[in-house]
Amino acid sequence: MQTLSLDGKIAAITGGASGIGLETARRLIAAGAIVHLLDRDRDALDSAVADLGPGAIADVVDLFDYAALQQTIDAIVARHGRIDILHANAGSYVGGKVWEGDAGRWDAMLNLNVNATFQTIRAVLPAMMRQGSGDVIVTSSIAGAIPIVAEPVYTASKHAVQAFVHTVRRQVAPHGVRVAAVLPGPVHTPLLKDWDPQRLKDEIAAGALMEPADVAEGILFMVTRRPGVIIRDLVILPHAFDV
């Protein structure tokens, strides 16, 4: 029977100081991995590392500084001799009606959800291809599979992520590298600050929101499959969420 052990594995998680990233780090560390948390918020990283213990390492980096991002990944590989898992998790959320949208907020979200995600994956692939193994898991969204009318620009960003994941997956599969996506429904994280407060209250009361830990447990399952098996897309939804 296959176990959920990650003994000796080296992982990096973007947006690792809070939410899904933090809870994923907690589970990877519990399974035996050493986890680098990549975030630009030094205080949040320090708090996360103190919470997670000695298996966590903080790396302050701005994901929009692609040279610094590459240097951070290279430093992780130099330190440990390899990198086994990348959880490209950093992202943001903007919902609402298109004609009421703010161009600056759209640009910021698209740059993080799309450009920074793509660049993070690009930065890690050469090392994984050289070693002949590795897992890249991207935090996508159910909005990447089913258009959500309340969030058209966010939906578009996650459709871009899905297209990238599955084209890159096929490019690197011959090198032993797995690229996959987790597609959660609504998760109770700070990203939902854009939601109407009454909607948030109602969804929590109805059981239509998940906790970050629910997604993190799915990611642990994905990265502990034996070589030759891939969970390409893992959709995780609150049972009461209708889409």
For each feature predicted by the language model, list its residue ranges:
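Residue(s) in the substrate-gating loop at a strand-loop-helix junction
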Residues: S141
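Conserved glycine-rich cofactor-binding loop
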Residues: I10, A17-S18
